[in-house]
Structure formats: C-alpha cells, structure tokens
Amino acid sequence: MDSYFKAAVSGLDKLLDDFEQNPDKQDYLPDAYAFNQCSVSSESASPQLALLSKDQRCISTCASSEACCEDANETFLEGKIHEGLTSRPNEKNVAGLDLLSSVDASTSDEIQPSCMRRCSKPVCDLISDMGNLVHATNSEEDIKQLLPDDPKSSADTLITLDSSSVSEALTVSSVDCGSNAVREEQNNINAGIKNRDISIKELGVKVDMALFDSCKYNRTENLKDKIISNELETVDFDMPSVLMEQSSEMSNTKDNPQYKRLPCELLKDDGCLAEEKVAVAVNNTECLEEGGGSNTIAMPCKLPENEGISPSDPASKDENFKLPDFPLQENRTSVFMKQTVKEDSRNLDLKDNNDIVHVSGDDVPPSLSCLSLSGSLCGSLIHNNEHSDILPPNESEGQNNDAVTIHEEIQKSDVLDGETDLSKKETCRSIFLQPVNEKKGEGKVEVEEMVISGESLESPEDASSAAAAGSPVALSAASVPEAPGPCEGLTFPSSDMDGQELDYFNIDESMRSGILISDAELDAFLKEQCLSNSNTMSAGENVNDSQLQMNQITMKGLHDENAGDIYFNAEAGAAGENGGVGNCETSDKENTENNGLSIGEKGAIPTERELSACQPDIRDELPVPSIKTQAVGGARPKQLLSLPPGTRSSKELNKPDVVDVPESEPCTANATAVSTCSADHIPDSQVSFNSNYIDIESNFEDGSSFVTANKDSLPENKRKESLVLGQKQPTWVPDSEAPNCMNCQVKFTFTKRRHHCRACGKVFCGVCCNRKCKLQYLEKEARVCVICYETINKAQAFERMMSPGGSCLKSNHSNECATDQPLQETQTSSTPSPTTLPISALKQPNVEGPCSKEQKRVWFADGILPNGEVADTTKLSSGSKRCSDDFSPVLPDVPTMINKVDRTHSPTVEKPNNGLGDIIRSEISQSPTCHTAPVERLPGNTGTEGLPMPGPFTLEDDVFVDSEEPSTPTVVPANSGLPVASISDYRLLCSVAKCVCNNISLLPDDDIGLPPLLATSGEDGSVPVVQERPSHEQIILLLEGEGFPPATFVLNANLLVNVKLVLYSSEKYWYFSTNGLHGLGQAEIIVLLQCLPNEDTVPKDIFRLFITIYKDALKGKYIENLDNLTFTESFLNSKDHGGFLFITPTFQNLDGLPVPRSPFLCGILIQKLEIPWAKVFPMRLMLRLGAEYKAYPAPLTSVRGRKPLFGEIGHTIMNLLVDLRNYQYTLHNIDQLLIHMEMGKSCIKIPRKKYSDVMKVIHSSNEHVISIGASFSTEADSHLVCVQSDGVYQTQANSATGQPRKVTGASFVVFNGALKTSSGFLAKSSIVEDGLMVQITPETMEGLRLALREQKDFRIQCGKVDAVDLREYVDICWVDSEERKNKGVISSVDGMSVEGFPSEKIKLETDFETEEKTVKCTEVFYFLKDQDISILSSSYQFAKEIAVACSAALCPHLRTLKSNRMNKIGLRVSIDTDMVEFQAGCEGQLLPQHYLNDLDSALIPVIHGGTSNSSLPLEIELAFFILENLSE
C-alpha cells in the first residue's frame, strides 16, 4: 500500500516541477474538474473521488487513511495561528491509477466512506488539506517567504515536496461575543511586520500530520510554546465604517513579489491572472472558562468539521484577480464537518476537510481558489448552501449557506465516531466581505474596497465564539485610474449592516428568533440575466434523509474584460447591474437540508438576502432538465453534476426571520436592476427551479459586462424590453409541449385548462393568464399573461411619465423582453400592480381560441370544450358577467408579493410558520428564459387597519403546510400589538381566543362579578389586554371619562360586548352592542337601557340576555326584525319586565352611538302585558311605543319600570284574525307588502316576487275573508297607531316629520266578502284600529281572488251605488318593488354593497370543525339579474352544496386564517352558459392564491354538477365565519 502512495507522491513532485518549469504550457491543457474532497458520505465517496484528478484523489485518499490510522496521537499547538501560509494544489490533470480503489479493493468502497470503512482516522492528510486553502499568487519567491521561520513548526505544519514548497494560507478570525468585535488574527510568517502583543489562551489543537517522505501516516508532534507573529485586527460594529485592513504591507503592495508566481497561478493567453485568496472558517468547538473567552486554532493540515466556509477576496488592493477569457466552470462546495468536542480535554479534533473545488475550462485548466468566491465572481458574493453528502442528517441542520457568513453550531449529536458530548451552541453572524468598488482596466479587475460587517451571537453559557473570516481586508482606496463604466460601485460603511446577517444558513429553532434580516435585502441581491448558448450544468444531487446534498457552484464563461463593478448595499437592499446586452438570470431559492446553486453559461450569482425571508412552499417533485456536460481529461463527473431527466424531491424547512428596513432608507442608484433577454438564444430545454436547485442558463455576448445599472439606464432598458411584447405575433407553443403551466407549474387537467398568452405565445393556466391588453399586431384587446401585462403596463406608464405629451412609446421591434421592476419598499408603495392580487382560479370568457368549431353551450375560457374540441369563442358571449378584475381592491389587506419575472411568474406570499415567524416564500419557475426582478411587496393597510397580514401561499393545491403558531416581525401575535381599527370590527375576536378559556359563558355565577374586560385604547397599534374580574368602580371610571372608548367585555371567545354610558335624547343611557353574533348568522344587537339615578353598577342581566341569544343562534334560532325574546323570571330587578322586542332601525337617530356593522337590531324592553302583542302583532306594539315616546316609528330606548301600553285583551278585531290566547295562528304577513292611504284612495302594493306568499294566504283563508299583514312603509310620512284606553282600541296617527300627512301607512288589510248587494253599497272601506277594512260583495271577492291568482291589478270602488261623486277607490297593484334588505351590508369578497339583493340563512346539516375551531356558513346572497325573478329552491340547494365544499376546503387552514385576522370570508360564485368563476376574500380583500387553488379543486366538481340543475345565469355569495369551539 505504501508503494502506491509513494508513487503518487513521486508523480505529484514531477507534476509540480513541470508546472514550475513550464508555466506557460498550460494554455493548451484540456478541461478538468478539480475536486478536493474527503468523503464521509455513504454514497458520494467513490463518485466524487472519481471526479478528482489523480493527484487530488491521492490527496483525498491520504487524508482518509490518516484519519483512520491515527487514534491517539495528537498535536497541540499553543499560541497563535500561522496565517499567510499558502499552499497550492497541482492544477494539472493526471490520468492514471485510481489510488483510492487500489488501496482498498473492497466492493463496499462505493457506498462506505473511506474513514468509516477503515477506522476513525484518515489514511493520509499530507495533501488533502492542501486543496482547501489555495492562495493564488504570481511570485515563486513567495513560497519560500511564506514558510514559517521556526523550522520545527514548519516541518510539522507544512509538507515539503522537494523544492516545491506547498504551504497553506489559514485565516482564523475570532469573534468577541461580548463586544461584538471581530478580532481577526492573521499570521504573516515571512515579513517583518510589527506584531501586536495579544495573549491568547493556550488551545490544544489536534493536528494530524503525515511524514511525507516515508508516507507513515501516524506521525504527530506536539508544538508547544511557539510564538508566531501575527496580526490582530478588531472590527467595531458601532463605528460608522468598518474597513478591515491588513497591516501586512507585503501583501498589500505591488512592490512585494510575494504573490507573483505560485504553482496554482493561472497564466492565460493575455497574461492575465486569476488570483484568489482563501479564508477558512474554523469552528469554535471548545469553551474555555479562563479569560472569558478563547480562540480556536487550526493547523493547515486539517480543517475542522465546520458548517460553513468564510471566503474572502485577495488581501491586496493591487492583487489582480480576473476571470479567464475562456468559459469557466467553477463548482465548489466547501463543507466543514462538525466535530466532536470533548470539553474536558479542550482539544479541537479537526476532522477531514470536505472542500470540493470544481474547475473546468474549455481551453485551459484554471487555477481556482477553493474559497475566494467573491473575487472570482467579480465581487458578487455567492450564496452557497453548504450541505455535505458526507454528513449524517443531524450534522447538517445548521450549515452556513453564505460564502462569507460563518455560522457555527455545536450541538449534541452523533458524529462519525459515535461521540455525543457536544454541548455548546454558538453563532457568529455576518462576517460579511464584499467588494464594493472594482476597477476595470487592461483586462484586470482590481478590488478597491471591501466592507465587512459582523455580529456575534452566543449562548450565555458559552465562553467564546471563534469564527474565521478569510483575510478580511479593506484595501486602501488608492487613486487608481478608473475605467469608464456605466456606474461606479459605492462604498457602504458596515454600520449600515449592523445587526444583519446573511440568511443562507440554517439555524436551530432556539436561535432563529434572534436572526433578523432587512426587509429590503431580498431585493438587494445582484440580479443578472443572460441567455445560454451552451449546456447548463445542474449542480448537486438529491439524497434521502440519511444523506445530505453536496452543493456546487457551476460557473461558465465569465470574460475577465467584462468582469466589472458589481456591488451590493446590504442595508438598502439594492443591487445594480448593467442591463446592456449582457444578460444574467438568477433565481433565488432556499432550503435548509437540500440546496444547490448552479450557474450555467457565464452566469454570476450575487449575494442574496431575503427581505421577506421567503421559504419555498412548492411541489415535492419538479422536472429536471436533461443537460449533459462533457469533461475532458483527468477526473470525470460520472454524471454527478449532469443528472438525467427525472424528478427531485424538495423539503420544506424553516428559514430565519426577517425585519423590514426603515421607511426612510434611501434608495441609491443601485436600487434597481435591469436585465435584458434575447429571445434569439432561447434553448429548447427548460430550466427547472425548486427549493434545492437554481439552474440558470446565461450567456454573455461580445461586449457584455457585469456593471451596475444607473438611474438613467433603467428606463431605457425597461422600454426596450417591454416594447417587443405585442408588436408581432409570437411563436405559438403547442399544447402538446406544455403539460404544465409555464409559470406556476400547475398540471393541466380537465378543469384546469390551457391558455395561450397572445403576447409571448406561451401556455399558462387561467390564473397566470387572466389579463387583457391591447396588442399592436392584433389591434385589439387579447388575453395576455400577468407577466406580459405587467411589462406592457409598466413601460407605457413610464413613457407617459417621461413623455410631455403623454403618448405611448413606440420603437422598432426588438427581441428583448423583460419585466424587471424598480424596487418598491413596503412602506412607500401605494398603488398595487394589476398582478398583485390573486384572481379567481377559474377561467375567463371572451378569449379568442386558436381555432374554431361549432358552438357549444358550455365551453372553457381558452376555447376548449369538455369533449376536448375547440370552440369558436368569437360567437359566444359572456352575458352580464363581471370580470374578476372589477372586484380587485386598491389596497389589499392580505398582500401578496409578486416577483415579476419575464415569462415566468413567481408569486410569493409571506406566511408565518411554526411559531418562529418564518416567512415562507415560494418560487417555481420553468421556462427557457428566466429573469429575476426585485420583489415588490404591497401595503396591506386599509383605513386604520394597520398591518399587512400575510397569508399563506403556494402554487399547488396539494402542497401547503399550515403554520400553527404564527409570530413574525410583520405579523402581530394574536394577543399583542394587534391594531384595533374599531370596536365593531369582527376581526377583533382574533385577539381574544388565546386570552380566555373556551367556555360558552364567562359570566361569573355571582350577582356582582363582571366578565373579563378587553382593554384597548382603540388606536392603531394598541395592544388589547384581557383583565379578569374587573370591578364596577373601575368600569364606571372608565365609562365616565371623556374621550375613552367603550369598555369591551368578553362573554366568550366568539362574543364581545361593548358598553358605554351615553347621553341620548338628553337622558343618560347604558349603551350595549355585541360583536360576534354575525359569526352564527345572527344580526348584532344593540340595547339603549335607561340608566337609573345613582346607578354605579353595570346591569349584568343584559350580558345574560346576550348569552341567551348566542345559545339560541347556535341552535339555529335566530332573532330578526320584529321578533321578540321573553323572560319567565325577574329581569333587571323587576318581575314586570317581560322581554325584548327587536326592531331594525329606520328613521331613528343613531348619531353618537358606536353602532356595530350591519345588519344589527335594536332591543326594546317590553312589559309582561305587552308580550301577546309582541308575539302575534309586533308591528302594533312597535308603533304604539313610538307614539308613546314621540319617536317615529319606534324608540330605540328601553325604559325601566314604565306602565304597559296595552292591558288585558279587549274587544279588538285581532280577536278574529289571531289567537291571542294560545298563539296557534296569527295574521299572515307578507314582507314588503305596503298599504298607503291617501285622500279618496287607498293602495295595496304587492311585490310581484311575493306571488307565492299571496297564494299561501288565499289558500289558507276562508271563503269570505282575506286578511294580510303589511310591512312598515318607509315611503309613508305617517302611520296608523292603535291605542288602548280603558279597554277600548282607538286609532291615532304618528307622523315622522310633524308636517301635514299626505301618505299614511296601515298595518294590515282585511277583505270581507259578506257585504250584501241590498245594502246599497258597492263596497265599504274604513280604518279599523291601525289597519284597513274593505267590505266587498261575494262577487267582488271572487273577482279579487281571480285577480290575485292571475297576478293582475284589481280596483274596488267604494261608496253608495248612486253617489258617483263621493266614491273612493281601493287599488290592488302588483309592483316591481325594490329590495330593501341588507341595508349597509357589504361583501367580504370585494367590499361591494349587497344592499337590495335578497338573501337567506343557510343551515347545513353538519358543521366542519377541527379540535379548536369551526367554519360556519351563515348566509347566501343572490345577485339576481332581474329583480323580479324569484329564487328557486334549486338555487338554494346549489348554494348549500357550494357551502359544504368550501367549508371542507377551508377546514384544514382555519387556525392559520384566524391567526392572520381572516375570520370572516366571502365566496362568490358566478355561473353562466359560457363561463364559471369564483372569488374568495376577507374584509374586501381577495384571499391568497393558495386558498383559491384549494377551493378550485373542491368547488369545480360541484359547480359543474350544479350547472345543469340551476337556472342560469346565477351569481351567489356565501358568508363563512371561523369560530372557536366552546363548551357549556
């Protein structure tokens, strides 16, 4: 076995010598994939090693062997770290013997990691760790200079390969968690730099060393008391600017030849260099109590098993690094495995380094640093989700996803050797390096400045936290000739970034609540967009729960001449780039366990920071493009990066919290990003995105460059990108090539039909293609997708703004198209985009189809018939359908976030998750061309409803995870900080459920105790507080104080009562109003109860009344207008109080009263003797009360202790019409039937739609008498009133205005057919009590019955036969009366008034409920096209079926909906012969798209099944309420 390693070492020596002697001959070398990896995964060991070149496979094998062979030998280094050491791997590809397979020929190599199948130590680490830390320089003398002065340490820490001295640069930064200062220790061995005397506690660092010459892999040596020169720099985050500069002048000047030539330097044809410097993140895995902190020290030979990497840019301002001219692929994943820490030994066990460097070039094998990502990517910080194949699942939960962020997490978990005594958990946050200004010139890119911000978090018990930030430098901004560019990068002080962190790492849930990211940071990532003319390499592969994914970054073809000023403002959340010809596509995804990042064809991925911290909520499987990549020479990919077509599984895990940036945050020139997309280079394959992968096809044409976009370039690019849409007919994508929506990926089914966008020609679903826009080539409006619609509108709006004449911009046809929008902050956005509101999931009518067939009665909006044929849509009409756009409100209360992407629509919605305040973001894109655009979040506040309440969102019906305990910075918890818009707002109940128990009555059993008090100031942002058992004195002080809002009592979790002392009609009254009865289908109740003199206690019996009403409503017994509720016991300390009569206020004065939302009723206290009239003829009692208290038609006040207005039943006509004893029968009352009496004539107006009620009266009445009760007429100016005096019933009139009466209303009419012809009268009409009596002959009665049956008008002449001039007339008229129900009621869907539309209660056989909550459908509104059309029984049955289906669809989401203040939901369904659609909303705002998707699946079968049984057109709206389950 030793011979193999010796042979490998010998071969490596020759390669290094040859490289040094012939550095210029590498221009013709073939492509190579240079990996450096120590695999501990059960699947990735052999495949990944196969990708390595021969020398690096030897490195990996040696590292694994060393880890297996050594068990007890440890090397301790006390003192300071060597920094500045450089090492270089051999960049040549060596084809030859696979050393790993030769050393161990067992068949389990493919599935067993090398260190696991041998022993717990690596076989050899003399070379493997060298690949981790590559510092590319251009000076051969630097090798010798960088060697440590101390020969012993040099011999033990560095591996000398003959004359080729390979050293490693190791940068370790220590974060002082107490002061949030980052102490960066950098070791420069050679230079005579002055050292700072900083004492550091001794740390035992286990260093596995290998004797190179003898290849004995068990050599260890203790290095003690080695004082090595180093530098320590501290970053103070409180300073306005934090520029970390190396004090090492030798690495910052051009004069020093230290970085002139190293073997890993890449010399290209033009002599340019690709240089990178590496920093290694070292986990602080040890806590030392001494000194309050400790520093973790790592030797170059082995790297700790860390969760992330900390790359940095070159340490010299003049050190030039540039991207090669040829297409360059860089795929790297640095994974530092977690390590086992034994606190008692204070030893840092440095496990194998799992750093994978993937280098590929078409012409020359480039030399790439493992970690210097920002340099190689023009300063763009790469989002690199570090998930290693080689770790068990429990060791990768908190891995760092950002290339410049160090996230340490040491927790108790099983590690490779079974040790489980990890106890500390630390997080070093946001050590953030980024080039802010880069200069271009002579084909070289110089980094001028770097900004670093950091923050350290640690547990209180942690002693220290150490993190490595690789050579974080702030290069001096020396005056350097600047090449002209569109825009120069700006220098942003790190104080702008205090307290922020990159979110590309996974954090334990215990730490997650402290992680806050700026609201603007999602938009701030650098977005570039490009077209690819070659294959895209899809990096990473999915593994199951026993494996974790190896992430790689593939990069192709970045021209160094074009590598230019890309900068990033972390606070303002701005990213800039030049739209120009260069295109770059970037799609940001996040995942905590499986995540990869792939850039194809000259793409650049900037640092991505989520302003909304969106977490993917997407389908489990997504199609993967089949893209193959050839590797020439050396190690071959073995299909690791080029996966076959198939599906990938994605998991949904939590991401960090976010916060919003201040409203005053300035937007700099880089606050906008523009990208152009050339449609000429669209490949056939589509790019698939999911939470694990970002496969980006990009292409830089000649002259393209990465430059920042200035303010002037954005509008011009915007116009050019959008003008192409609609100017000529697009290429029509065949239906056969689009099984899924090309935007949201929804699969097309029988009900989810295809829709072609007339602007881009792609195929979308009805949700993504529901807009209409006028296109030039059609010269008329046509269906377009939401993306094209947005693009065209934005361009036109901008042109109108920029053009003095306001004319639309016109230009020549171009193949460019984009929809990138300027960044708009949440606080400053005022006008939503047309695409920001979710639209109905069903189809829209009047859309031109691709071809035509014969006309059918039912057809889908895209012209497809149910039998699969295509309908001629031009011959069909949509009737009187209202477009769903008409219902779109201006300001959504539940905002959605739309990521406007050209041709691909990536809606995102904030969603609370798992009580940690995570905001879920879903993005699924599939299109040959993809753009990235800033996310625009819309404001959600309407009126005083302060906060935007996010709603869960997803793109698939079957993919959604409800959050159970939402708590986010943007979502106020249910019982804290909830803005109170009004005491009558039904959403106020959302804050109560968690504060009280689930009893149906919270009234204390004693006579004094009051229910809990919900205290709130009533102002926006006030915090409701529930107080148990408030005192009466406290309530009186609260109610009598001026300016105080009503006191709100909690009767149960579903019912509130507002109490206030008011002056009404110059008297003092207790005012009670309920809030919550709407949820049961019951109108809210108000009571104005007379306040007795010196009364200082709240009348508790009113609370009992409301509890009784609530319980009756639960049973389906509702109180409506002129209904009553009676008592059998004493009420309000009086046995004379018999109950309440409830009326609907009409002409009464309600000024100054905090009335609830409509509908509501007013309860009037009645006496026991008045109960019979309240039961059999309540209108008489109501009018009598009005006459008594001089109110018209009735008072709203309840007077205690008054005398009854009616006594014992005397001789009244009602004895003939109603049963005043047993209440067995009563007067038939027809709603909206009015009786108007004027001088000389009377008119009985019967609504035509009440014909069925009239027929019931005729059939139930006897042969000679027809009696009908009337309704109160608001058209009359007075009304007849019956007054009982001394047992005699007399007639009075009560006037509304006090003016002379013209039209007087009556309460009933009686037709008596017993008048004899011999009486000499044609007919007699007279006023009896408060009604009209008409006596007619039997012949006239028959004529009246016939006229009523035939719905014809009928006139009765009254008077004597011979007195023609004195006759009066009684006219029976059928009228088209206007519906006056639902006054003041508005729709929950869009805020539209439903006044005048009929409605009825819905009683479902069963309620849909969970363990805690219930969804209840209470009412259905009928939007009749013709007011005379009566409601058919089939319509009601259809409404019930819809209610059942909707309740079932909403049931799984009840908790989330109510947590987001959506406890009242409206569903509107519209059906016509050629169209079906529905809309769902809450408080006038449409629901998030996810619920529409769920409703789509549930409602479509019911809707299509009901179309054949219902009369069309039909439009109904159902009201749903979410209630708490209460117990008796």
UniProtKB/Swiss-Prot annotation:
Q: What keywords are assigned to this protein? A: Cytoplasm, Endosome, Membrane, Metal-binding, Phosphoprotein, Zinc, Zinc-finger
- Phosphoserine modified-residue sites: S120, S803, S833, S884, S927
Q: Where is this region: Disordered?
A: 629-664, 819-849, 928-949
Q: Indicate the transmembrane segments per the record.
A: none
Pfam families found in the cross-reference section: FYVE, SARA_C
Q: Where are the zinc fingers (FYVE-type)?
A: 735-793
The protein's matches in InterPro entries, at most eight in alphabetical order, are given as: SARA-like_C, SARA/endofin, Znf_FYVE, Znf_FYVE-rel, Znf_FYVE_PHD, Znf_RING/FYVE/PHD
Q: Where is the composition biased (Low complexity)?
A: 821-838
The record's section on SMART domains has: DUF3480 (SM01421), FYVE (SM00064)
Biased amino acid composition, Basic and acidic residues: 649-658
Location relative to the cell: Cytoplasm; Early endosome membrane
Annotated Zn(2+) 1 binding lies at: C741, C744, C765, C768
Keyword Phosphoprotein set for record: yes
Q: What Gene3D superfamilies would the database entry show?
A: 3.30.500.40, Domain of unknown function (DUF3480), N-terminal subdomain, Zinc/RING finger domain, C3HC4 (zinc finger)
Read off the domain note.
Answer: The FYVE-type zinc finger is necessary and sufficient for its localization into early endosomes and mediates the association with PI3P.
Give the multimer and partner information.
Interacts (via C-terminus) with TOM1 (via C-terminus); interaction is required to target TOM1 to endosomes. Does not interact with TOM1L1 or TOM1L2.
Q: What is this protein called?
A: Zinc finger FYVE domain-containing protein 16
User: Where does this protein come from, organism-wise?
Assistant: Mus musculus
User: Gene that codes for this?
Assistant: Zfyve16
